[in-house]
Amino acid sequence: MASPYLTVLEIVNEVCDRMNIRRVTTTTQNMFTKNSINLLNDIMEELADMGTWNELQASAAVTMVCGQSLYSIDTTSLVTAKQFIHSIQEVSVSGRVPPLEPISDKNEFRMLNRVNSIGQPSRYIIEGVDTVGNPRIGVFPRPGASYAGNSAFVKFQVLPPKYVAGTDDSVVVPFPGRVVVLGLVAACILDESGGAETRQYQAAQMKYLASRNSSLGRQTAKTGEYVRVQPGITSRS
C-alpha cells in the first residue's frame, strides 16, 4: 500500500501522465518538467497560506532572561523543511496556563517596552528577524526574576521549502499527494494556454479547489455539524 504523500518526481510524473507527456527519470529532463517545479513552488505557497495544516506544525522553545524583552526563535537546528516559519500560532510560557495575547500594533509594543515593566509575560509580538533570518518575538512585561530560566514555547506553521528541479526529486512534499497533483495539473493547463482560463482549466481548477478545501476541512476534526467560513472557502467541518 503506497503512501498518500508523494515525492516531487512522483507528482511531476503523475501530471505528465494526465497531460499525455512521457514520464521522466529526473525533473530536469525537459522544459515541461523544469517549469512544473516552478509551478509546484507556487502551489506550495498557496496551500500554506490557505490555513493551518497538521503536516506543517512545529514548535520551538527559548529560555527567558530576566529583564530581556526580545528573543530569537532558533529554527536552524531543525530539519531542512522546517527552517523557515510561515506563521506563529501561539506563544506560551512555563508557569502560566493561558497563552500570551498577541500585540498587532508595533507602535503599541514600542510604547509598552519603554515602560520597562517587569513581571509575568502576558503579551507578545513578532518583531522582525535577527541577523541570520530567525524570527524574533518580543514579550511584555519583561520576565521577572522568578521567570528567569523558564521556557517560552512557540507553536508555528513552517514554510515549505523551495524545490529545485533535479536536486529535490526524492523529497516528499508535505501536503496530501492528490491535492498537489490536481493543483499542478490545473496550473500546467493554465500555463500551457498562456493564462487563458479555458474550459479545460476551469474544470481542472474546480477539482483542485474541491480537493483542497475538503482536505483542509479534515484538519480540524471534521464532523459535519459546523460550517467553517474563510475567504475563498465555505466548507462544513
Give the predicted meaning of each segment.
Residues 1-237:
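Glycine-enriched, solvent-exposed interface loops adjoining structured elements
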